[in-house]
């Protein structure tokens, strides 16, 4: 079994996070590098997962008011480490820190079964950027 550690994000983690984003094809986060870096610096929820001997292999980033809502902006695990329960561990870690909040997130259709398996249910939402 792999030994992992969840810890608070540090600025020195950013380049590795961007590598994971690039490998996943999340080009918007990679191309908007400075905006993404600022997003991490301004996030109230920002944790990484380290695997022993391999460094950062995943992360979770979000925003919360600490009482009612916690919004997950991104949750991503390196492809080599998926299926080991790391994403589940990150979600549980965050929910333990903010037990009174409901967690909300947008997710891809391919991750639906993962989130439903963790007890999350679909909800309806909207999205718009200023340029639209």
Regions found by a protein language model. Name each.
Residues 77, 83-96:
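Conserved acetyl-CoA-binding loop-helix of GNAT-fold acetyltransferases
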Residues 115, 120:
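Conserved active-site tyrosine of GNAT-family acetyltransferases
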Residues 1-31, 126:
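Short amphipathic alpha-helix that is part of the acyltransferase structural core
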Residues 9, 75-77, 111:
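Hydrophobic adenine-recognition pocket in adenosine-nucleotide-binding enzymes
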Residues 96-109:
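Conserved GNAT acetyl-CoA-binding A-motif
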Residues 37-48:
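A short helix-loop-beta-strand connector motif used in the catalytic cores of GNAT acetyltransferases and
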Residues 121-132:
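Active-site/acyl-donor-binding loops of N-acyltransferases
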Residues 48, 55-64, 71, 76:
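Conserved beta-strand in the GNAT
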